[in-house]
C-alpha cells in the first residue's frame, strides 16, 4: 500500500448488497429523524438510483435541479457529477447561478468531477463575479474544479487567479489556487508563482504554496521548503518537513547539510506530527550519522513518533541504530515490536532474519505475517519460499508478494511456484499468483488462468478474478496470435460477468470484451427503487434537515465518537450502519497505521484483503480531509466496501478522490485517542 493511497480490496456482489440493505430495514425503521414528504423522498431516491448505477437520467436530474428545496438541488448537482457523463455540463452550468451559495458550490464541485474544459469560462466568471471580501464556498469550489480539469486552459486560469494577489495581500481564492496547483502536474503548474508566495506574510498562504511545491517535487521548491523548516508557524514547518527529501535536493543541486540540520532541529519540535514528518524526511538521506539524534525518539510518548523513529533507524542503519532497536524486539506493544523487527532487518539482514525466526513459528498468524515482512526487508528468498507452505493463506499471500518484489519477473522457479499456487484455496494467494504470471506472459498459461477466473467467481472477494483478467490481458497484448488465442479460449467462451469491476477492467485490458460482453455501464446495483426510497427516507432526508447519525468506536486506547455524514454519502452511510448493527466490526484490529497519515481497518481477514462481499460506488463529495476525517478505503474507483480510514491530519491530496462519510467529533479528546492508536490495537466494538 502506498502511503498516499489508502487501499481496500476489490469485490462486488449485487445480491449480497441487496441482502444487507434488506436486513437493515427492521433496525433502520426504529431510527429517529425528521420526517420528509414522500414526494421529496421520491425525488431523492431517483437521484440516488441514477448516481449509484452511473446512469445519466436526464429526467431525474432536471427534476432535482429545479426542486424548490435547495438541499435537494444540491443533491442533484452532486449526482450529476458522480454519474460522470459529460452531457451533465449543460445542466450544471446554469446552476452556478442558483440563488443559494451551497447549491452553486455543489455545481462547481460536480463540474470538477466531470473534468471538461468547457466549464472553465463559467467557473472563472463565478470567481470574478464577487469582490475578495465576498468570496465564499462557490468561488473556492470553482478554483478546485479548474485545477481538477487542468490542461493548458486550467493552468492559465490558475495563473490568472494567482496574479490577482501578492505575498503581502492574498484572498481566499488565491489561497485556494495555491493549495490546488499541484493537481496541474509538474509540466503545467505555476512553479514560479508558488515560490513567490512562500514568503507571504500570512502563514495560511505560506503553507499552501509549500504544500503544492512539495507534491510537485519541483526543484525550484527545494530552497523554500528548507526555509520553511524554520518557519514560526507549526503547520508550515510540518508541511515543509513533509516535502523535503534527498531526491528533491539532488534535483536542485543543493547541499543537503542545511536541510538535514533543519530536520534535526525539528526532532525536538513540540508538535508530534512535525517530528514524524522530520523523521520520515531524514530517512531519505540514508545517513547513519543522524542515528544518534533519532535514537531518543524511539521512546517518545507518541506511538506514531516512536514507530516512525524505528522506521527511520532501519533505513539509515549503522551500529547506533541497531543498538537502539534491539531492546524493542521484546516489546509487548505489537506496533513497536513489529516495526523494530523490520527495521533491524533493513539495517542488518542476518540479524533481522535471526530475530524473525521465533515469530515465524508463532501460533498467531499475525506474527508469521510479520515474519514475512521481515524476510522481505532482508530479501531472504529462502525464508519466504518456506512460508509458501504456511497453513494460513494470509501468510502465504504476504510471502508471495515479497517474492514478487525481490525476484526477477522471468525467474522460472518462482513462475512455477505461482502456477501451483494459482490452485490455492485462498483468493489473495491466487490473486498474487496471477499477478506474477502477468509479469512474464506466455500463451501456455491461458487455460490455467481461465480456470482460475472461473474458480474465483465463488470467492468472497474478487481480487483473484481481476488478477486473472489482468494476466490474460498481458498475454493478449504480447502478440496478435496470443490475442486471438485469448479471445477464443476466454472472451468468446465466457459469459458477460455481472461484476461491473470485472467488466471495466476487461474493457481496458482485453478490448475484444467490449464487443463480446457489451457496454460496461450502467451498473446493475442490486437495489430496487424501494431500497433507494428507504435510504432517502431514513438517512438522507433527516441529514438534510440537520440530523446526522453517530457511531461509537471503542478501541484499546479509548472511544471515538464518529458523526456519519449522510447528506454527503447516504448510500455509504446506510451500508456502514447496517454493518455496525450486525456487529461486523467488533473484535477486529487496526491492520494498517501510517504515522501522521491514517489508521485503517474494517477488514474481517485482518490483512488488508478482506471485505463484506459487495462493493459500493464512490460518493465523492466536497468535504475536505482534515484531522479525524473518515473515508472509504479503495483499490480503485467504485471499490468501497467495509474498509475505512481515519486521517491523523489534513490530507488535501485525498480530497475529491476518496468518499468521505464521517468525522471524529469530541475535540481534543477524540484526537488524543486517534493519535494513540497503533497497528495491531484492537477494535472492541463499533456500535450506535
Predicted regions: what is each one?
Residues 426, 444-688:
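Cyclophilin-like peptidyl-prolyl cis-trans isomerases
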Amino acid at each position: 500500500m502506498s502511503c498516499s493511497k489508502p487501499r481496500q480490496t476489490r469485490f462486488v456482489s449485487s445480491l449480497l448488497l441487496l441482502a444487507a440493505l434488506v436486513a437493515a430495514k427492521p433496525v433502520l425503521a426504529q431510527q429517529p429523524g425528521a420526517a420528509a414528504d414522500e414526494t421529496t423522498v421520491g425525488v431523492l431516491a431517483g437521484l440516488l438510483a441514477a448516481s449509484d448505477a452511473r446512469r445519466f437520467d436526464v429526467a431525474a436530474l432536471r427534476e432535482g435541479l429545479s426542486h424548490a428545496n435547495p438541499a435537494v438541488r444540491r443533491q442533484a448537482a452532486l449526482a450529476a457529477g458522480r454519474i460522470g457523463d459529460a452531457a451533465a455540463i449543460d445542466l450544471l452550468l446554469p446552476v452556478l447561478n442558483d440563488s443559494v451559495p451551497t447549491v452553486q458550490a455543489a455545481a462547481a464541485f460536480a463540474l470538477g468531477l466531470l473534468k471538461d474544459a468547457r466549464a472553465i469560462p463559467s467557473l472563472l466568471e463565478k470567481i470574478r463575479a464577487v469582490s475578495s471580501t465576498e468570496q465564499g464556498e462557490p468561488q473556492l469550489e470553482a478554483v478546485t474544479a479548474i485545477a481538477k480539469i487542468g490542461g493548458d486552459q486550467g493552468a492559465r486560469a490558475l495563473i490568472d487567479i494567482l496574479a490577482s494577489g501578492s505575498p503581502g495581500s492574498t484572498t481566499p481564492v488565491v489561497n485556494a489556487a495555491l493549495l490546488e496547483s499541484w493537481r496541474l502536474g509538474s509540466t503545467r503548474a505555476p512553479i514560479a508563482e508558488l515560490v513567490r508566495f512562500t514568503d507571504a506574510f500570512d502563514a495560511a498562504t505560506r503553507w499552501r504554496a509549500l504544500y503544492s511545491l512539495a507534491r510537485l517535487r519541483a526543484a525550484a521548491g527545494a530552497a523554500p521548503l528548507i526555509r520553511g523548516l524554520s518557519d514560526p508557524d507549526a503547520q508550515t514547518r510540518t508541511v515543509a518537513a513533509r516535502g523535503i527529501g534527498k531526491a528533491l535536493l539532488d534535483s536542485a543541486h543543493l547541499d543537503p547539510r542545511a536541510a538535514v540540520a533543519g530536520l534535526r532541529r525539528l526532532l525536538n519540535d513540540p508538535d508530534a506530527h512535525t517530528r514524524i514528518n522530520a523523521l520520515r524526511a531524514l530517512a531519505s538521506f540514508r545517513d547513519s550519522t543522524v542515528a544518534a539524534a533519532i535514537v531518543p525518539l524511539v521512546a517518545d510518548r507518541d506511538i506514531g513518533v516512536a514507530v516512525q523513529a524505528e522506521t527511520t533507524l532501519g533505513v539509515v542503519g549503522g551500529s547506533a541504530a541497531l543498538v537502539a532497536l534491539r531492546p524493542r524486539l521484546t516489546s509487548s506493544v505489537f506496533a513497536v515490536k513489529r516495526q523494530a523487527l523490520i527495521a533491524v532487518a533493513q539495517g542488518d539482514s542476518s540479524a533481522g532474519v535471526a530475530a524473525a525466526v521465533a515469530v515465524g513459528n508463532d501460533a498467531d498468524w499475525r506474527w508469521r505475517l510479520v515474519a514475512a515482512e521481515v524476510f522481505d526487508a532482508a530479501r531472504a528468498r529462502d525464508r519466504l519460499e518456506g512460508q509458501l507452505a504456511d497453513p494460513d493463506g494470509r501468510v502465504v499471500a504476504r510471502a508471495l508478494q515479497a517474492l514478487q518484489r525481490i525476484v526477477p519477473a522471468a525467474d522460472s522457479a518462482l513462475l512455477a511456484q505461482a502456477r501451483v499456487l494459482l490452485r490455492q484455496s485462498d483468493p489473495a494467494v491466487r490473486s498474487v499468483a496471477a499477478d506474477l504470471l502477468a509479469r512474464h506472459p506466455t500463451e501456455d498459461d491461458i487455460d490455467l488462468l481461465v480456470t482460475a477466473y472461473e474458480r474465483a467467481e465463488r470467492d468472497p472477494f474478487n481480487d483473484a478474478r481481476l488478477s486473472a483478467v489482468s494476466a490474460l490481458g498481458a498475454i493478449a497484448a504480447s502478440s496478435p496470435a496470443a490475442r486471438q488465442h485469448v479471445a477464443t479460449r476466454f472472451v468468446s467462451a465466457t459469459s458477460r460477468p455481472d461484476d461491473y469491476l470485472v467488466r471495466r477492467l476487461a474493457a481496458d485490458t482485453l478490448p475484444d470484451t467490449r464487443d463480446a460482453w457489451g457496454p460496461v455501464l450502467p451498473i446493475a446495483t442490486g437495489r430496487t427503487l424501494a431500497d433507494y426510497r428507504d435510504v432517502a427516507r431514513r438517512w438522507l432526508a433527516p441529514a438534510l434537515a440537520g440530523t446526522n447519525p453517530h457511531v461509537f468506536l471503542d478501541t484499546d486506547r479509548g472511544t471515538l465518537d464518529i458523526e456519519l455524514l449522510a447528506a454527503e454519502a447516504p448510500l455509504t452511510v446506510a451500508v456502514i450502519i447496517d454493518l455496525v448493527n450486525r456487529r461486523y466490526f467488533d473484535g477486529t484490529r487496526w491492520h494498517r497505521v501510517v504515522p501522521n497519515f491514517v489508521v485503517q481497518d474494517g477488514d474481517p481477514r485482518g490483512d488488508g484483503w478482506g471485505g463484506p462481499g459487495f462493493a459500493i460506488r464512490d460518493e465523492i463529495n466536497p468535504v475536505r480531509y482534515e484531522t479525524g476525517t473518515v473515508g472509504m478505503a479503495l483499490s480503485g474507483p467504485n471499490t468501497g466496501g467495509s474498509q475505512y480510514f481515519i486521517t491523523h491530519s489534513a490530507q488535501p491530496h485525498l480530497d475529491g478522490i476518496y468518499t468521505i462519510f464521517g468525522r471524529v467529533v469530541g475535540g481534543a479528546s477524540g484526537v488524543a485517542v486517534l493519535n494513540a492508536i497503533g497497528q495491531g490495537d484492537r477494535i472492541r466494538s463499533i456500535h450506535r
